[in-house]
Amino acid sequence: MGKLITAILLLLSFSANAQMNFCTNDLDSYPTRSGGRIKPLYVLATDTIKFITGESKVDDLSATEAFCKLSLKAFGMPLELPVMVRVDHVDVKKILGIKDSEHSIAVNEALTKMSILDTELAKTKENNSYKKEITKVKQRLEAYTAIVEARLWTVPIAKENDIEFISLGEFLTETRIAVVREKSDNPVNFLFAEAKDQFLKVKGDGYLLELRYFKMNLFMWAMMATLIAIAFLVAMKNKWPGAIFTAITIGLQLTAITMRVMISGRGPVTNMYETVMFSGAGALVIACIITLFRKEVAFVIAGLCFNILSLLMMKFANGMLDAGISPLVPVLRDNFWLSTHVTTIILSYAALALSWVVANALMIRDRFSKVSSAEYRYGVDLVYTCMKFGVVLLAAGIILGGVWADYSWGRFWGWDPKETWSLIVLLVYMAILHGKSTTWIPP
């Protein structure tokens, strides 16, 4: 009965004009809590809509507008949006009755087939790609249900000089709306504005850094600067224009990484997205450092090439990489060791990736054009220079990892798979470098 009265009050509160003025992109900056931290509504809406549909929009609506309108369905608002649920696995498409050429199913149709997904999930014992896709589709449907039941969107309320977050369903109650109707013709807008003001007084607007981080899209600008830098360094004898755009690229990426660190409060190396991000920028910085000593622009070009590959992965490999900022798993909740051991290891990946780029460029050049023996030996020397940096960083990272293990678990080395294989990799690279410095590997 209470929900019915609330729905009626909401319908009265939302004239056609007011409804249009509420669910707008002005809500992008609204504070909400999800995944254990405070973030702008824009981030929650974009991540959730993209997770459900694979797109950042629903029809012509932005993620924030669609998220808002879907959330108001819980209160009887007459809103119908063509939400499509992403389905990628061909066998999951079959059980849901989707053509192989299609990549999504209408959410209302998918909800009627939830029992089919549950049955298939129970039948499938092996944790293969089929089972993972069923689980993911179920999670998408559960996320949609949480939105339309007004459970996912949380709203701040002041409580004893602090802020708590409650679900939208708990926030828009009959009592609150009835009280505020005496103060404003648009009680819902008034309630939300009042809650935001109270939040800003207590917590401030530091959470808006995340909104600026995503809106500025610095990695896209860095991608463009990287392409221009490569073109200038390859095509022009005067290397200064390329050097300037290389510096711009580094500046953009370091700014973006710094913002991400400030938002998360930890080192930017906790998942695959951040590994790709940090290794790409790290490779370019290491390439510039090596160039200062060797005076060879090929290192910078190699760093830019690996960097553009990393940026392309970050932009387009959405199925593999998640750009979201998530809380740390318990084993990584030590910011000092995370910022030393893990960053050192990833910088070693970056240096070794430079050797990979230089070596492949040398082989391709040798395959399609004549490379003199002197040029070939010089190219090989560039490869080994990158490897030396990588091996030093890898060794340092492994030692730091052992110290962290001793600090956390009371033992320096336990021969678990990660420790064993990291040592194998280090020994292989050390054998190659040793062979090059002796007579094992000919010049």
Model region roles, listed by residue range:
Residues A18-L208:
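Soluble extramembrane regions of membrane proteins in the secretory/endomembrane system
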Residues L9-A18:
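Hydrophobic h-region of N-terminal signal peptides that target proteins for export
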Residues V300-N307, S373-A396, P443:
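Interfacial and helix-entry/exit segments of alpha-helical transmembrane bundles
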Residues A195-F214, T255-V276, G319-T343, S372-E375, ...:
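Membrane-interface interhelical loops and short amphipathic "cap" helices
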Residues G204-I308, M314-N318, G324-P327:
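Core alpha-helical transmembrane segments of integral membrane proteins
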